[in-house]
C-alpha cells in the first residue's frame, strides 16, 4: 500500500511511501524516525484524527490503514490540553473538528473523497454540525470498548439528566431510555433464540374449482362470510346469479362495497362437491373462504399436518412457492357485513317476476351482543315471551320460504335474530 506522511511541524510532505499492509506499526515508526524526522518523545502520529500508539505491534491492515491514506506528524499534546479536549461538550468537539479541517488542507483533501460536498459543509457551521455531527460523535465515543454512558446517548444529555434525575421531564426521559433498553434486550434475545419470528408466514390457500374453473382460495377463519370477486363471478359464469338486493358494505380493517350475493354454487374441493354461498365484492382476491362456510361444513384447520379437512375430504395448503406474490397484497379483511336488506326490499325489473329462491334471506347487520332490533322501526314485529322483537319484514321473508310463523319466530329466537342463520336452521 502507498501512504503519505505530512509533518505539520516542518510543513514537509513525504511520499507516497510504499509499504506492506502486513508491516507492524512499530516497524513503520522506525522507518519514519529514519526518513521523516519522527521522534517518539516529541511527536505523535495521527490517523483520521486518532493518535496511533507507537508501542502497538499490530499490522497496518489490522489498524484499518488502506492505500493512499494520510498520516500526520504532530507535536505531543500536554496532559492538561488532553484533559481539556476530553471535557469538551459535543458541540464544541464538533466545532473543533471543523476548525481542524479548515486549517488542514491535507486532511480535508483526503476526507473529501469519502464525503462529497465537504468544502461547502466546512464553511457552514450549522450545516456541518447537522450533517456530520452524528458521525463525528460516533467516532469520538466509538473507540471505547463500552459506551460512555449506560444509555448510549450523547454525553451532554446524560450529564444533564443525571444532574437532576428527579425533575419530571428528566424522570420521563430516563424512563423512556430504560424502556428502550428493555426493548433492545428483547430484540437481541428474539434474534438469537427465535429468529424464525422475523420470517414472513405465508397465508393459507387451497386449490378449489368453481364451475370447472380452477381457483386458489384464501382460507380466513377471521372473516365472517365467504367472499367472491366480481372478476371471478364473470369468469365462472355466476355474475348473472348475483342477487343485487343484498347490496351493502363489508366492514373490517377497512370497508368494501358489496355488489350482491350468490346464494348457492357448487365448489369442488379435491373429489368432493359442496354447496357454498358467496358475498360478491369488487376486490382483488378471487375467493375468500370465511367462517360461515368453514363452520357449516365442520372444517378443521390442521397446521401441524398443513391440511384443511372439510366435508370429509382433506386438501393440502399451498406452499409459498405456489402462491402468486400478487395474492399477498391487498387482502380484504371484512369481518362483518351490513346489507341493504335491513330495509324493506324494493322489487326491481329483473327480480319482481322471480319467486323467492331457497336461502334468499337477507343477512342482517351484526349487532353488539346480538341484541334485539330497535323497536322504533317502521315495520311491525313479533314479540316473544322474553320481550324480544323481530322485524315483521324478516318474519315474512322466512315465511315466504314455506315455513309457519311459529317455527320462524322460534328459529329467530334461537339465532338471536340472525335471519340467515335462522333460515339455515329451518332448512335442516
Swiss-Prot record:
Q: Where is the composition biased (Low complexity)?
A: 338-354, 371-388
Induction of the gene? By DNA damage via PDR3.
| Source domain of life | Eukaryota
GO MF terms here are: aspartic-type endopeptidase activity; polyubiquitin modification-dependent protein binding; proteasome regulatory particle binding; protein-macromolecule adaptor activity; SNARE binding; ubiquitin binding
Its EC number(s): 3.4.23.-
Q: Which residues form the Ubiquitin-like domain?
A: 1-80
Give the matching Pfam families.
Answer: Asp_protease, UBA
Which residues are responsible for catalysis?
A: 220
- Residue limits of the UBA domain? 389-428
Q: Where is this region: Disordered?
A: 328-388
Top EC category: hydrolase
UniProt GO BP: positive regulation of DNA replication; protein secretion; protein transport to vacuole involved in ubiquitin-dependent protein catabolic process via the multivesicular body sorting pathway; ubiquitin-dependent protein catabolic process; vesicle-mediated transport
**Subunit arrangement?**
Forms homodimers. Interacts with RAD23. These interactions are mediated by the UBA domain. Is also able to bind ubiquitin and polyubiquitinated proteins. Interacts with the SNAREs SNC1, SNC2, SSO1, TLG1 and TLG2. Binding to SSO1 is promoted by the phosphorylation of 'Ser-49' of SSO1 by TKP1.
Q: What else is known?
A: Present with 6510 molecules/cell in log phase SD medium.
Q: Which family does it belong to?
A: Belongs to the DDI1 family.
Provide the function of this protein: Aspartic protease. Appears to act as negative regulator of constitutive exocytosis. May act at the level of secretory vesicle docking and fusion as a competitive inhibitor of SNARE assembly. Acts as a linker between the 19S proteasome and polyubiquitinated proteins like the HO endonuclease and UFO1 via UBA domain interactions with ubiquitin for their subsequent degradation. Required for S-phase checkpoint control.
Name recorded for this polypeptide: DNA damage-inducible protein 1
Q: Which organism is it from?
A: Saccharomyces cerevisiae (strain ATCC 204508 / S288c)
